Regions:
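Charged, alpha-helix-forming regions
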Residues: 1-311
């Protein structure tokens, strides 16, 4: 068994991955400001969105321990054909992940379920670190589609119930979401002035908000699995008992982070994603193990403080 110090974790990586991880570490070495502290609901650090397009699939589920999340794709009214309803797919990739973090962060910092949004879609995309390109296949169109999918997706949390039952909890995060479509179809569509979280989600968020360094997620915006690993590490390592490390076998890691890949492919790619996540979390104490990885109690990147609610 070998301790995985910050430099050891990249020993088995390709040279190009080692260079990328060194660059990620440099980006977060500067002092952190309050603007760099973002928040995410603890459930979203344990049950994740798809990594790739699920095409015509209308549902998605992931399990972590005794909890599961079920996503069901929604639909919208096509503004070009008011009498028709268009199905939208499941959200996937980095864009909806960063958007949900933005919404959670604004709710916590503003202490309100009513979230002010940047004045335009491009302004919000720049805040999240995405490049801006137009056209049918550009990043603006892709971002709009992913956020629409996220806003219309139905969330269900499955938790242990009494006497061996399973409890299904409907937990849609967004209650209201307005999109303005300008009359000029060539004009760039503007983002809504605000979105509104459901009362239930906002109440839960106040008690279960996990702080993290947004620069870490922004630096790995093209690696959604690495983003998920980073967020999971931020809330999980600090809760592991000092004298009882957590062994995550490959099958357990695959169940959480595998997505649609095969186990063989996952085992090839996971070390690079873990190294990318750890580049911004050098305090993470992780050891390679023949059956997977051993995780030890570690100081969180940002200490959790209770969210104070204004009366």
């Amino acid at each position: 068994m070998r301790h995985a110090h910050p430099t050891n974790i990249v020993v088995h990586l390709r040279p190009i991955d080692q260079r990328r991880i060194a660059q990620l570490r440099e980006r977060t070495e500067t002092p952190r400001t309050s603007a760099d502290v973002w928040y995410i609901h603890t459930v979203l650090t344990q049950c994740f969105l798809p990594y790739t397009d699920q095409k015509d699939r209308r549902d998605w589920t992931r399990q972590n321990g005794t909890y599961s999340i079920i996503l069901t794709a929604g639909a919208i009214r096509d503004p070009r054909h008011p009498r028709e309803v268009r199905e939208v797919g499941l959200p996937f990739g980095a864009k909806p992940r960063l958007f949900q973090s933005y919404a959670n962060t604004q709710a916590v910092k503003q202490q309100s379920p009513v979230i002010p949004v940047e004045r335009s879609m491009t302004a919000l995309m720049k805040t999240l670190g995405f490049s801006i390109t137009g056209g049918h296949k550009g990043t603006i169109a892709s971002f709009k589609e992913q956020i629409t999918r996220f806003a219309r997706c139905h969330f269900t949390v499955v938790a242990p119930g009494p006497r061996g039952t399973e409890r299904y909890i409907n937990a849609p995060p967004i209650k209201q979401f307005d999109v303005w479509f300008p009359a000029n179809t060539d004009h760039e569509p503007y983002w809504p002035t605000e979105i509104v979280l459901t009362d239930e989600y906002y109440s839960s968020l106040k008690d279960h908000a996990v702080p993290y360094d947004f620069r870490a997620l922004k630096a790995i915006q093209n690696k959604p699995r690495a983003q998920d690993i980073y967020l999971w590490l931020t809330q999980r390592l600090c809760r592991i008992p000092y004298n009882k490390p957590l062994l995550m076998r490959w099958k357990d890691l695959y169940a959480m982070f595998g997505g649609q890949s095969t186990l063989k492919k996952f085992k090839q790619n996971f070390p690079a994603d873990l190294a990318a996540a750890r580049a911004s979390y050098p305090e993470a104490r992780i050891e390679e193990h023949g059956e997977g990885y051993l995780f030890r109690n570690s100081t969180p990147p940002i200490p959790k403080t209770k969210v104070i609610v204004k009366k």
